[in-house]
Design a protein with these regions (language model features):
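Long, compositionally biased charged/polar accessory segments in the mid-to-C-terminal portions
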Residues: 102-103, 110-128
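Alpha-helical structural motif
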Residues: 26, 84-88, 96, 117
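Iron-sulfur cluster-binding cysteine motifs and their immediate structural context
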Residues: 10-32, 51-56, 60-79
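Glycine-rich adenosyl-nucleotide cofactor-binding module
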Residues: 1-13
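Extended alpha-helical surfaces
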Residues: 69, 75-91, 106
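Short Fe-S-cluster ligation motifs
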Residues: 38-56, 87-110
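C-terminal, charged low-complexity interaction regions
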Residues: 131-134
Length: 134
């Protein structure tokens, strides 16, 4: 069955980039999009990335959507095993490109490459230092 949006506003409230506005969606401020975007980012884009600790993707809207509550766990083992919930920034940054490919080459984020992910780590770290809170 097709599930229509309930217009509860949860996604609008939680979105780090405020990309939802009624029925409109602005992908250019979506954190998931920005974590994959190549090149330098504007200060505003950097701040959006730094709002959550994820270096790739976001899915905050999916997390709060009522349609995603109480759904059954997938029967596909590949989606339930070998999960990665944390990456140590320092260890990640010290990997050579070859080590990165060997360690993370089969992960969904690996196609974007190490440099973009390190850039995202940096934005998150910079925004969440004691100095940035002043």
């Amino acid at each position: 069955t097709k599930k229509e949006c309930l217009h509860c506003g949860n996604c609008e409230k939680i979105c780090p980039g405020k990309c939802f506005s009624g029925s409109a969606y602005n992908f250019a401020t979506c954190k998931s999009y920005l974590t994959q975007k190549k090149g330098d980012l504007t200060v505003q884009e950097q701040k959006i990335i730094a709002k959550t600790p994820y270096i790739f993707g976001c899915d905050e809207c999916q997390r709060v959507c009522p349609h995603n509550k109480n759904i059954p766990v997938t029967p596909l083992a590949d989606f339930r095993t070998d999960l990665l919930s944390y990456v140590d920034a320092r260890a990640f940054k010290n990997l050579t490109n070859r080590q990165f490919k060997e360690t993370y080459g089969k992960r969904a984020f690996s196609w974007r490459g190490k440099a973009i992910l390190i850039r995202n780590f940096t934005y998150i770290e910079q925004e969440n230092t004691p100095e940035s809170k002043k």
